[in-house]
Amino acid sequence: MSSNPTAAMLVIGDEILSGRTRDANMYYLAGELTKVGISLAEVRVVSDDSDAITAATRALSAAYDTVFTSGGIGPTHDDITADCIARAFNVHIDVRDDARALLAAYYEQTGRELNDARLRMARIP
């Protein structure tokens, strides 16, 4: 008998833990995963701390088939999730051409500049 694939969600952010921001992504993700037969088995919330993010990523990826993250992927210096994911899996991180193209198209459409800070969002492990 086969079981459904499992997933975990790692929610990242001091603003979540302090109550300043309410996470709305878990509810949406759980519903969408259920529709396709994937069981969301655990949700963990950690602070904007690189060691906490890296450790949680390693622990969750060892226990579940897929790990989704929410938070810390913006254009500011404190958005460190991508770097922590790279560290958790011991892989290199750099700007990916397809991600750069998506961001360039978006910012061109909105009439805003794709600056270095925004280009950080195209960095993928």
Name each model feature, range by range.
Residues S2-V43, S47:
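Glycine-rich phosphate/diphosphate-binding loop of Rossmann-like nucleotide-binding domains
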Residues D14-E15, G72-P75:
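Short glycine-rich anion-binding loops that position phosphate/pyrophosphate groups of nucleotides
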Residues S18-T21, A52, H77:
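Secondary-structure boundary/capping motif
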Residues S47-R58:
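Structural motif
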Residues D65:
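Conserved acidic residues
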Residues D79-P125:
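Proline/glycine-rich low-complexity loops and linkers
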